[in-house]
UniProtKB/Swiss-Prot annotation:
UniProt cross-references to HAMAP family, sorted A to Z: HSV_DNBI
UniProt-recorded Gene Ontology molecular function terms: single-stranded DNA binding
Keywords recorded for this protein, A-Z: DNA replication, DNA-binding, Host nucleus
Region (Disordered): 1125-1145
Organism the protein comes from: Tupaiid herpesvirus (strain 2) (TuHV-2)
Protein name: Major DNA-binding protein
The encoding gene: DBP
Record localization: Host nucleus
Any one biological process term the GO annotation gives: DNA replication
Domain of life of the organism encoding this protein: Viruses
């Protein structure tokens, strides 16, 4: 059902001027959330209710744009998600961190890379607000003024063609602050005469009447901030460098409806072509695709954003939990700073990923991919050949113009002769559209990100830089603020910066968006999942008549068909979750899992309880898996299972990230990249059928652009990736009280009249979501085997303490082996290697043997079927993994799955030394030793440690979406055509990887461990849960950071086969080496032990005990001696009082446990109950074949 446009977008102004009293606390909050730089007198604040706008503020309106005889024409637009503070912004800017001469850095980047610079209108002075202040009765020195503007009117604000109407000022509340807001009307409403063809032609940057010159809102500093933050950024996304022409055409597009005309191509230049080896035909095709993508994205940005959106829940500042929970103003500022620390992890991913959306500004032709597939068309080959990629290496190349002639680059190092070798501050400034506001904000985040040391420099590079700054030799700030300037920030994170690509690569792109709640991200995703529309199974006749139409591709009620093929509907006959819910019901009845939180509630008093509870649970899981196999064989087929798809949605509402102007900037970059990727579908069709035969690209576009626009409008949305919705106007003509604009322009008299209003366009299209998918079950190409990364040729034998029961063995170690005296890891290491000393109390030998054999059998059986290759961390994940592993193996699948993982941000304390921004003033240290001593004194004085955002793995990835998270994800846009006569092209977002070693340590590949391809099978979503905050490797150069090396040593220690050595003590010795007795954070230990939560908790607990005992020497020798003297294995572990069994009371040597392992080595599967009976068919065939034989009937 379509929404009513009259309700979504009421009549009213689409630009407002706010006049707010200067209040310290209000300015403090804005300083924390806004984009500011000391070089600019403008601040860019977030668009938030009760902070910058009032509660009655409308984010979508039908705004008057011109007059006709007897009435006013209106058009729908939505607000740009930011407020631009231009008067007394120093009250905000002065409260922010100084980052050096960022304005100078941006100017250097413009000169170096040929970016257009802002040119103020020399003949025009800034608006004098004296009369306005007098009319409002305010003191201009005591107020802050800012503008909020609609997407369609942003060009008018830049050009000073919005007229404030003080007569219509109204008083509003911004939280507890009382302010004024005045409407800003477009200059076209005050033009001489009604709207005519002649009057329309007068629209432009320099087309103003004397009235607008006199009364229009024009502030040069505001126009300059808009020039870079808004328009240069849009131009970069479109690969268009003539910024003033872009602004001029954007103004005409909104006021004159020129969406279907060619606007940018005559002035466009094409970079990155001369360094590609292309045939003339390939070059022409690429040029045309480039031009079409640029024009379509520019046109349809107006279609999508001059639309009617609803405000996002995140926009209500006063309802943020962190605001409501704040105990005073200082606590509020601390919480806002913590919010930004969470965001820093996402900002870091955008900066450190070589495939970040900030760098994807080049369009390239991959000739090797331009092959027509069997049964395909030339368009299919072109779709695969034309791709977007990293554009940092072509910034100084010569270009081609509209006539395909070479235009020399005018900057230094032009023509490609000065290719950069490494990422510099100028490259980041370019990626920020050379906006000082954006660049300065990024520096704030870079100053608070963790340092990744490589072992070659350690932290010494930072310390030496800061000592060097003592003589005022810092190039960024000349010694003014070396503790926080951009040069110091780059020295801190130098090892994490992305390398400049040496060759073109087709890669997924990294972006940050708000996630939607609806997702299908469990092991098999959409397969066998019933939705609201699937309450009744479709008849056989309906399936036969329209197998692919049972659910529309874009149905928001479900993320896809039950199976994964193009038709993919048979799988919906199967209700997979019915069987999984039976398992959950069993867990609830037996008090194994808390039904509300999902946490473990299993109570174990001893080994018998443990085996009984686990046997019953395993029996229930296996029976459910077998029942699902039976149903699938009756109602579905193997292809439907193989086509399972995991999917989740990203919110494309522009206000979903309105709380951060930096993320709002990135949102528009992401939008333009997505839309241009989809534009290539329409482009490829016309380019293949209509080769370039005219003298210029713009002439070709003039011939075909209207047809291309129509094709794009029909095939861009609801084809698998992008989803939109429409809203229509129920009545096109209304009467509203507007002032007499002509009289106001002529005499200044303000008279309200009942005016007829007509809406120019009766329907609008709104962006909803972008869908990202992953196929968990790998498939090779046609006739090709599955990739080696997914091949499961060998089933690894695992120590139980590293297997599926590890979380239980750690949790109940003291109850299973009371008085043992060994840590859980050390105990099972010795058991597994048949080296358990007789001095260890194990109870009765027969019970002990039975228990160990049971644990070994369950672990081995699980490993035989483990296709997920991710150790469970609790009972909920254990039953989910076991259920799906069993089902897939019983059904004949034997290769590893591709898995989705969620990593959520956490704030952890760090060493003061690595965060010089803690210094109150620019450092004046004579040596590194003096620097180190100063920071040690800070710590002793009680200065709180700085915190950084790090990631921890979620046990279930769906919790990322259920907790309404901000997510950073990498995905590519895949396109494929149907095989029928319609030849429709569909597309989907395929989740990918982050390019670069500095993004997040959990994503890095340890090159020292060959043959383990888990990193190629795992895909990650980086997330920050906003609930409780704002809502109730292609082969790459590998850099080994110190943390990676330490992790390798810790894992090697834990894997040691030396039974005379406690593995946990060996790990502790590695972790504590060089720390000076300082305990590590739990999250760091969790990283070192490869995410094994139970083991990490055990190690952290043991370290705390050792420190509490006063241990200062953490060498392995000292720790071993301390353990022996303190009642370790050789001490108090034995003895009748602790339940020691045979030989435990002072025996020597080791227990002989070899008999426990004989059966395990000869058995493949150990099942219980009906499942075991079902599989007990004899014979030497593959165990996965037994269910097939049993179920053929």
């Amino acid at each position: 059902m379509e929404d009513d446009l009259n309700t979504l977008a009421p009549l009213g102004p689409a630009a407002w001027l706010f006049v707010c009293p200067r209040q310290d606390e209000w300015c403090d909050v804005l300083a924390a959330l806004s984009l500011c730089d000391r070089s600019s007198s403008v601040a860019i604040a977030p668009l938030l209710v009760d902070l910058t706008v009032d509660r009655d503020f409308q984010v979508a309106v039908r705004t008057p744009i011109s007059r006709y005889e007897g009435g006013v024409l209106t058009k729908v637009t939505s607000m740009w998600p930011a407020a631009f503070v231009f008067h007394n912004a120093e009250a905000i800017v002065s409260r922010t961190e100084d980052h050096g001469d960022v304005g100078g850095l941006c100017a250097e980047a413009r000169a170096r890379f040929g970016v257009a610079s802002y040119r103020a209108e020399a003949e025009r002075a800034d608006t004098d607000f004296t009369e306005l202040w007098a009319a409002l009765g305010v003191d201009g020195a005591r107020v802050v003024m800012y503008a909020v503007v609609g997407y369609g009117l942003k060009e008018l604000l830049y050009a000073g063609q919005l007229v404030p109407c003080v007569e219509e000022a109204r008083t509003v509340l911004l939280g507890a602050v009382e302010a004024f807001k005045l409407p800003l009307y477009p200059a076209t409403l005050f033009a001489d005469g009604d709207a005519t063809a002649d009057g329309a032609a007068a629209v432009g940057l320099r087309s103003r009447t004397p009235f607008v010159d006199r009364r229009g809102l024009y502030v040069s500093a505001l126009s300059e901030a808009l020039f870079y933050y808004v328009f240069t950024a849009l131009g970069q996304a479109l690969r268009f460098g003539h910024t003033e022409h872009l602004i001029d055409e954007g103004m005409k597009q909104f006021l004159q409806d020129t969406q279907n005309s060619v606007k940018l191509a005559p002035q466009k230049r094409y970079y990155g072509y001369l360094s590609q080896k292309l045939t003339p035909g390939e070059r022409d095709q690429l040029l045309l695709c480039d031009a079409i993508a640029c024009e379509l994205a520019f046109s349809f940005a107006s279609v999508y954003f001059d639309s009617a959106y609803e405000p996002a829940p995140l926009m209500n500042y006063s309802e943020w939990p962190l605001v409501r929970a704040a105990e005073g103003h200082a606590d509020l500022l601390r919480r806002l700073s913590e919010l930004k620390l969470h965001l820093s992890a996402h900002v870091g991913a955008l900066v450190f990923s070589g495939n970040s959306v900030l760098y994807q500004t080049r369009i390239a032709f991959f000739s090797a991919a331009n092959k027509v597939p069997a049964g395909g068309t030339a368009q299919d080959g072109l779709l695969k050949a034309v791709q977007f990629c990293n554009g940092l290496t072509c910034l100084t190349e010569d270009a081609l113009n509209d006539a395909c002639r070479t235009v020399k680059f005018e900057g230094p190092g032009g023509g490609g002769g000065g290719r950069d070798e490494q990422f510099t501050p100028q490259h980041l400034a370019w990626a920020c559209a050379t906006s000082p506001h954006l660049m300065s904000d990024l520096v704030w985040y870079l100053n608070r990100l963790a340092i990744y040391n490589t072992g070659q420099n350690g932290g010494s590079a930072l310390y030496e830089h800061l000592v060097h700054c003592a003589v005022n030799l810092c190039p960024a700030c000349r010694g003014r603020c070396c503790q926080s300037c951009y040069q110091t920030a780059f020295v801190r994170i130098q090892t994490r910066l992305p390398p400049l690509p040496k060759q073109l690569k087709r890669e997924p792109f990294v972006l940050t968006l708000f996630s939607r709640f609806l997702c299908d991200v469990d092991v098999l995703g959409t397969f066998g999942k019933r939705y609201a529309g699937d309450a009744k199974e479709p008849s056989a006749a309906s399936l036969a008549a329209a197998p692919g139409e049972a659910r529309k591709v874009g149905d928001e009620a479900g993320l896809g068909a039950g199976g994964g093929g193009p038709g993919g509907r048979l799988g919906v006959n199967v209700d997979r979750l019915k069987y999984f819910n039976q398992i959950l019901d069993y867990c609830k009845r037996n008090s194994l899992i808390d039904p509300s939180t999902g946490e473990d509630t299993l109570a174990v008093r001893g080994r018998a309880d443990f085996m009984s509870a686990l046997s019953g649970l395993n029996r229930c899981v296996d029976e459910a898996a077998m029942a699902l196999v039976s149903e699938v064989r009756m109602k579905s087929n193997r292809d439907e299972v193989a086509g399972a798809t995991q999917a989740f949605n990203l919110d494309l509402n522009p206000y979903a990230v309105a709380f951060s102007p930096l993320l709002a900037h990135q949102y528009y970059r992401a939008f333009f990249l997505i839309v241009q990727n989809l534009a290539l579908v329409s482009a490829s069709s016309y380019v293949v059928d209509n080769p370039l035969t005219v003298s210029s690209l713009s002439r070709w576009l003039l011939q075909h652009f209207q047809s291309i626009c129509g094709a794009f409008a029909s095939n861009s949305a609801r084809k698998g990736l992008l989803f939109t919705k429409d809203a229509k106007c129920s009545k096109s003509v209304e009467f509203e009280r507007f002032m007499d604009f002509a009289l106001y322009a002529a005499s200044g008299r303000h008279v309200l009249l009942s005016t007829e209003t007509k809406l120019c366009k009766l329907s609008v299209c709104m962006l909803r979501t972008c869908r990202v998918k992953n196929r968990p079950i790998p498939r090779g190409g046609k006739g090709l085997p599955v990739s080696v990364f997914f091949k499961r040729d060998v089933v690894q034998r695992r120590n139980p303490v590293r297997g599926c029961l590890a979380f239980l063995l750690y949790a109940f170690h003291e109850r299973l082996f009371p008085g043992c005296g060994l840590s859980c890891l050390d105990f099972w290491q010795k058991v597994y290697h048949n080296a358990l000393p007789k001095s260890v109390a194990i109870g009765k030998m027969e019970e002990f043997n039975a228990f160990v054999k049971y644990v070994l059998n369950v672990t081995t059986e699980y490993n035989e079927h483990d296709l997920i290759d991710v150790p469970p961390s609790n009972l909920l994940s254990y039953v989910e993994y076991r259920f799906h592993n069993k089902f897939l193996c019983f059904y004949g699948f034997g290769d590893y799955l591709s898995t989705l993982h969620g990593l959520s941000t956490k704030l952890v304390p760090q060493n003061h030394l690595n965060f010089p921004h803690l210094l109150a003033a620019s450092p004046k240290f004579a040596s590194v030793a003096e620097y180190v001593l100063y920071f040690k004194k800070l710590k002793l004085d009680g200065v709180p440690p700085p915190h950084v955002a790090t990631f921890s793995r979620e046990s279930l990835v769906r919790s990322v979406f259920e907790n309404r998270s901000l997510v950073t994800v990498a995905f590519g846009i895949e396109k494929y055509s149907t095989s029928g006569g319609s030849r429709e092209v569909f597309h989907f977002g395929q989740i990918g990887y982050f390019a670069g070693n500095g993004v997040e340590r959990s994503l890095n590949v340890n090159s020292m461990g060959g043959g383990d391809y888990r990193y190629m099978r795992q895909r990650f979503v980086l997330a920050t849960r906003l609930v409780d905050l704002l809502l109730r490797r292609s082969r790459r150069e590998t850099v080994l950071f110190d943390a990676d090396l330490l992790r390798t040593r810790v894992l090697a220690a834990l894997e040691s086969h030396d039974t005379q050595l406690d593995p946990e003590l060996a790990a502790i010795a590695e972790i504590m080496d060089g720390r000076g007795g300082e305990p590590p954070e739990y999250e760091d230990v969790l990283f070192f032990v490869d995410g094994q939560e139970c083991l990490a908790a055990s190690i952290v607990g043991k370290i705390k005990e050792l420190i509490k005992k006063g241990v200062e020497d953490f060498s392995l020798t000292a720790l071993g001696a301390d353990a022996g003297a303190g009642g370790g294995p050789a001490g108090s572990a034995g003895g009748p009082e602790s339940g020691g069994g045979a030989g435990a009371a002072g025996g020597e040597g080791t227990y002989d446990l070899s008999a426990l392992f004989l059966d395990v080595e000869n058995e493949c599967v150990v099942l219980e109950g009906p499942t075991a009976a079902a599989l007990d068919g004899g014979g030497d065939g593959d165990e996965c074949a037994f269910p097939a034989k049993r179920l053929r009937l």
